[in-house]
Structures are given as C-alpha cells and as structure tokens.
Amino acid sequence: EHFFSGLKEGTFVELGALDGLRFSNTYIFEKAFNWRGLLIEAETENFFALERNRGQGKNAVTLHAAICAEEKLLKLYGTGPEASINRDSKMIKAGKVSWAPCLRMEDVLKRSGIDNIDFLSLDVEGAELETLATMDFGKTPTFVILVEMRKVDEGSNPKIRKHLHEHGFCRF
C-alpha cells in the first residue's frame, strides 16, 4: 500500500532466495501480482530446491550464483538458510562446504534484461554490504530495498545504512 499501490508488472530481484518459498519476500509479488523477476541463490542444495519451487514459472528466472565485485568461485560454509561466506559465523553448522560462481551484478542484470528494480530483497547472511557495493544504482534505478540484518551483524548495520543513504535511500 505504501510503496507499490497501483504498480502493475513490477520487477523484483531476490538475492539469497533460498528455496523460493520459505522466507521468500518475492513469492507474493510473482504469484498474486504477476510481477517478473530474478531469484539468485548461491548455496547448491538451496538452489536445487529453488529450481523445483519457482524455476518452472513464467515470471521468474533462477540463477545459481553469488554477487561479487569481480567474477570468481566463492566458497560457502554450512547449508540451508545459514550458509555463509564467513566460516566463523555463529549461525552456521560446521562441516559442509560448497562452491558457487560469483558474478558481477551489472552483468547478471544485463543478461537478465533487467534495467530497473522495483523491489530488491537482500538476505545474504553477512555479505549484504559487499553485495550492495557492487550495485550501480545510476544504471539500474531501484525503488525499494529490503535488507535483512541480524543481531550478529550489528557491526555492519550502520555501514549498510550509510551506504544506502549515500545512494539516496531512506530508512522506513
């Protein structure tokens, strides 16, 4: 009502899309409002679930990747919702390691044909600031950004807020 009232055919990007259903911030936009978008998930098992749950739809494209300043392979620790690039994270369970391609956001958006974002959902387990820093908001206008910030990330929260404020966003 406050942000998207009357908006038809919106565009979303969800980074850290998990399985596309559990904790999804974009599912309702796709299914109830016919929005189109991009679902990005780095952890392999989560991505396979994302493909099963949302990959067959006409409105969403899925991508197995993380977002970085430069292309590389990224090592992830743990599985499920707590998978993280930080192996010292208090949230992950020891043991499992996986790898994901890390791509530049500008390249991903260009390949996906996305030139504006109405809703960006960001839940990347401690890599929020690094991910936001790769975005060129001048090239890809973005209307609303939802950033998940956990108590364990308190040190980065003010930096994220400052970064977004410097790019014209306000906290709501």
Identify the meaning behind each predicted range.
Residues E1-F172:
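Phosphate/nucleotide-binding beta-alpha loop and adjacent structural elements of enzyme active sites
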